[in-house]
Amino acid sequence: MKVNKKFLRNIFFLFFILLVSSCIQKDSDSNQDSSPAYKNPDLDVEQRVDDLLSRMTIEEKIGQMVQFVGMNHLKRSEKFLSIEELKKSDASGFYPNLHSSQIPDAIKSGSVGSFLHVLDVAEANFLQKHAENSRLGIPLIIGIDAIHGNAMVRGTTVYPAPLAMASSWNTELVEQASIETASEMRATGSHWTFAPNIDLARDARWGRVGETFGEDTHLVGEMGVAMVRGLQQGDFSSRNAV
């Protein structure tokens, strides 16, 4: 039987083209997985969010709504926990059936998305490192009560309480203090403060009157806006904004 060499050559060439195309497609798929859209800072926010949500499991979405106190709080409670507190499960920084040693695994599994009152940068970096090693690498949100300065963290600047700030009627001073507060928060690993408190202080029996700007609606509004301007610094593009 005589073999048509031209026919065989064409078959071989076609096979070679298909093989190369397959390799290119596999390489393209691999690149897409290693650099997903939600990690691309050049894309718009909505596109990145949509891509991330499409990849998240329901457990990971729930995890983003879970917040624990910082590990140092947990360790302190574990060390000094009384029998009475253990019975009532009401100790500060205590969670039944959760030990501080389990926190890294909770982060890596996507079971927690936020921490409260992380009081030093070493702890913040420790927690974020475990978040980097999670399946999707979603950073943790770290919040703190920076009501009048980042005062819960040792060595930071403490400003007068908001009620005293309001007595100055100086919104520029309040804004500048808030800028400095945001800077010190970011330097210690926090991104979120539970301030300002813009409730109206109408009942002196309330325990958080000192965290407000008083009872006057106009003054509270002006001071609240000034504090927000200082903390957010516009569009959050500043590395020191919170």
Protein language model features and the residues they cover:
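Bacterial N-terminal signal peptides
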Residues: 11-21
